[in-house]
Amino acid sequence: VFELRGPRFGRVLLYVVAFVTAFGLVMSSSLAQTEAPAKSIFEPLTPPENVTAKAVYVQDATAGTPLFSLNPDERRSPASTTKLMTALVVANNTTDWQELVTAEEVDVRDISDNESMIGLLAGDVFTIEQLMYGLMLNSGNDAASVLARHIGGKLLAAEGATGDPAERFIQEMNATVASLGLRNTHFVNPDGLYDPDHYTTARELATIAAQAYAVPQIAQASSAATYEFTTQGPNPRVVTLQNTNKMLGQDGVIAGKTGTLMESGACLVVLLEQSGNQVIAVVLGSEIEFDANQIQMPETDQRFNDMSALIGEMTERFRWVQPGDADFPGLTQELAVWDVRLGDDHAIVLPAESAGSLRYLLQLGPPAQPDAQVGTLLIFSGNQIVAERPVLQAGTA
């Protein structure tokens, strides 16, 4: 006999049939007599009509819940948002962020190339940390080149192999893509310059961003408005970096990465927080115009307007609720009575129209060892399951 309780469901005694207890989960008889719940995951919304981006994906990465979606699986050139993967591969292969790296002639970019850069010179000596800031703030293609060559060389050395260090780095980028289970992403360079075989999707770029921003050094660099350091080497000088993400500090945005090419349009990835949850928002192919010299015209750049519109719509159309007594009175006490706890206590994101009529049902199986899953917390709006949380046995081993 198991006792399951939930506000508005009342107290129910269940005599559990053997084939049900085999799964350790049961359903309240008061629910069993009603119509079956609707699907538990709501569909992401279409972005507002004034958003110009060709592809959009917004996801609560903590809850794993998509919020907005437009052509999320369309392969597109990501421009310099590529550098999120570059940064991730660097981080995955770095233990000492103060390790010194020397720039070579192959890394130098000229202003006439119309490439973003930090202005390094051959012979300049940087720490990996400094180059990470150059990668994430100024979107320096020269910083990407130095890092790719350095990390690629380390990988070759560790393998006892020879070859082109930059090519080895690109192999590692695509190996990381495969390890993340991404099927519509492929890279041919570390900086994002256009190539028809260099692509990702809004959905998969959001996955890459979530992985990258989970690295403290990447998140810290991406969240800095400015950064200043002095180079070492034959031409010591002060380098001042400025973040290209104009949304930093606005609308809750705490980090981000821009990218722009004629072939890509204006691209932007941002990280923001809602009730402790991390939200990743991606726009690819926002409107932007270029002059006769193929220089972007900032006054025509719509990516920041697109992102602001998405965030504004998000805060109106969704609500974040905590699985505790504030939003679910009595839940904490009931968990204590049964000596169980939630295995996941992050905020639940719901459509705004669902957030005002919530109730819960605690499904429990027999007691088990501490930290073993013994049930599920179901969150309902009407008869629709809108969220689930694992319930674990409390106590100590």
How should each PLM-predicted stretch be described?
Residues 8, 12-15:
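Alpha-helical transmembrane segments of integral membrane proteins
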Residues 15-17, 80, 252:
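Hydrophobic alpha-helical transmembrane segments of integral membrane proteins
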Residues 27-28, 340:
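N-terminal type II signal-anchor transmembrane helix
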Residues 32-203, 209-216:
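Active-site-adjacent loops and short helices of periplasmic peptidoglycan-processing enzymes
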Residues 194-199, 203-204, 209-397:
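Domain-terminus/edge residues, biased toward the C-terminal soluble/receptor-binding domains
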